[in-house]
Amino acid sequence: ISGLIYEETRIFLENVIR
């Protein structure tokens, strides 16, 4: 369960950094 949230959060953070 937390794995899915972690993956989405990771993509979100990458978009914010860019």
From Swiss-Prot:
Signal sequence coordinates: none
Cellular component, GO annotation: nucleosome; nucleus
Domain of life: Eukaryota
Annotated localization: Nucleus; Chromosome
Single annotated GO MF: DNA binding
Keywords, ordered alphabetically: Chromosome, DNA-binding, Nucleosome core, Nucleus
Function: Core component of nucleosome. Nucleosomes wrap and compact DNA into chromatin, limiting DNA accessibility to the cellular machineries which require DNA as a template. Histones thereby play a central role in transcription regulation, DNA repair, DNA replication and chromosomal stability. DNA accessibility is regulated via a complex set of post-translational modifications of histones, also called histone code, and nucleosome remodeling.
Family: Belongs to the histone H4 family.
Assembly with partners or alone: The nucleosome is a histone octamer containing two molecules each of H2A, H2B, H3 and H4 assembled in one H3-H4 heterotetramer and two H2A-H2B heterodimers. The octamer wraps approximately 147 bp of DNA.
Protein name: Histone H4
Native source species: Pseudotsuga menziesii
